[in-house]
Amino acid sequence: MKHLSNLLPYLPSTVLLIGCGSPSKQEAKNDQLQKPNVIYLIADDLGIGDLSWYGATKVSTPNIDRLAGQGMQFTNAYATSSTSTPSRFGLLTGMYPWRQENTGIAPGNSELIIDTACVTMADMFKEEDYYTGAVGKWHLGLGPKGGTDFNHEIKPNTQDIGFNYEFIIPATVDRVPCVFVENAHVVGLDPKDPITVNYDHKVGDWPTGLENPELVKMKPSQGHNNTIVNGIPRIGWMTGGNTALWVDEDIADVITGKAKDFIVSHKNEPFFLYMGTQDVHVPRVPHPRFAGKSGLGPRGDVILQLDWTVGEIMHTLDSLNIADNTIF
């Protein structure tokens, strides 16, 4: 049985709609119209000093600045952790990650870390008749204990913890497998070329950053010297799934496009979108539109790319005339 108490302090009061009796059809319709859409975008490894709104002078982030100027800004904020998996766990569950096992930085083949009996933020929105979606970086595991089988339907997944729709990066872009998962299936996977993933030892014969440094377009650091995919050495080893592999330069476009599609598809109903960007986490491989544009190297370039993503979401909301009824 799921319990609501963990997340009650975290849910916006606008979503906690409590009534007595049976509302008329008109009242129900008005209630639907009054529910704001909610978009929670979580960037990765972005510092307060990276944004021009907060004082950055060598890089400009006009779209994020516009968002800040139209809303609230926070100059004193805290997270449950400084790393990916535990901070996302705390955000979605309302629980301290150190009070549950296996909430350290998850490998790419980790089981689903959030207990399916736990009430998540997505569960609470869904209970209030929101259509819920998770798009982008996930890094909270997928599948059962013992590891994820990426060659069949992946269960449990985000749809077992409150999300109606998912299009996600299973872990992080610097970790294998380098594929997208949409609604429990690896996108573009050829069944004749199954994926194998291991974080203990090498699998298959794909080159690695350690053994074949001449093949990389980005030098490895901090253990990023295992299987090479798209010229980038990753953490962990994989083989197979050639038709499903992402292209790093296109990831921001793909994730942003899926988020926009989600918004357009559900513009006539209240929706909750949890969107995790790859930017500005390593490996920093910007699209050619942004490569070299900041004058500050790859990190500066992907900050520009992140700002573009925010701008695309804002433009979509504006074009659908739902920006004023969306908390972003």
What is each model feature region?
Residues 2-4, 12, 20-328:
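Formylglycine-dependent sulfatase
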